[in-house]
């Protein structure tokens, strides 16, 4: 695991988070100082992503050293109040557009932008251009420690180098300001998140701390399941998470062997855990077609037989998405299926089912990503459902993008094309509603919209109503996951869970809850507030919740395991 936490009081912070989860608020401690790196040492409150060395390793006896792209040291918590002071004492081994800087609420405050080495900032407040504040020359020198102070008070931010104010920003946003929901539970609202990154520099960190007048909200701890750059795999992407009938956790992913591209030598792989996520097996290959694309895993378990099915898609590594042809030829996208009867240890030879799973005028095609479902109620109880998407290229007509469903009524032996949505939707997941309807929640594609698309089927996924945009589910045009946590009974409401990067850009992975079958989403938790993308949810047999998610620019796929769900209203 490449993410490291400071040691010492992890248990205390974990218990605080569980308290928050159950709706118990910790005491507010005004003026609290939160030390992330103190005297060159990572504290129990900080975490790193990527390579680092510690004070005393011979590189520097007094500093924590962070090196390279996609390497961060961040606060292992969020802060309720946005009124805060961020302080860092650091040095860079070089200047020259290194990209090193301080992250504050989705904005980067950097030290040497461009060839002229200017101090500046970038992020939503500044639009598509970088804001230049001052010249680095005379203020920052290579291998010379300097002090950075960022102070936010009632939305007014000041940026100082060595005590000199170099920049000011009015109306600076809090961390969660862009979540468009007035009824979200208070436990997830964050005023501030922060991190340091090295990028193209060797960043020596002598001190990194936050002073805040509000409460500190620890983030859930995570475990890395797939680390990009490990073994023989350049990049792992596209997670799917499933619990077998026996309770085994199966974490699927694409293993992109020689590059991070969507078109490469890609295999579908899985790792297994028989102890609730504590330990994991080695990687098992599910589907490998030489050096071609064999990915987009969409697994589903048949609860009546215990068989685990995995559907995925294939294309030649020489054919990019925009080059895929309609039909079923060698230049087209094809659908394959495999299964396991021993809880995911071994997998049958994959079978091509394209003829029954794809229409002639479809070109691009993707299963999932994420797990499928088995219907539990109504006329179609037992039906297996696989969410998919495709691009349609009808002869003489415009190309359009749609979500659709594959279904099986004979325990996975045969598959049929079911409901299709209207144009403008893409990757999707399905969930069964209390009345047996099937709801499809879809990513937007090809339209200027940043809200999830929602479609309803009243016949088990064979036809859809026209879809609607859900203004409570903001998205950056990215895959998301939706799952049923529990059914309603006489004592408690049913619960749906939804996870995605909850802004217009790919960060702030949130887990939300609905108690009215997706009409509203009044409760939410922050899972990971930094760079993130695809995710998948699973509900453990004991009621705990697992979220498998991409993070840190696809450098890893992590698993967060959370306690059983208790709405704020139940625990007040």
Question: What do the predicted segments below correspond to?
Answer:
Residues 28-55, 217-218:
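Extracellular carbohydrate-recognition regions
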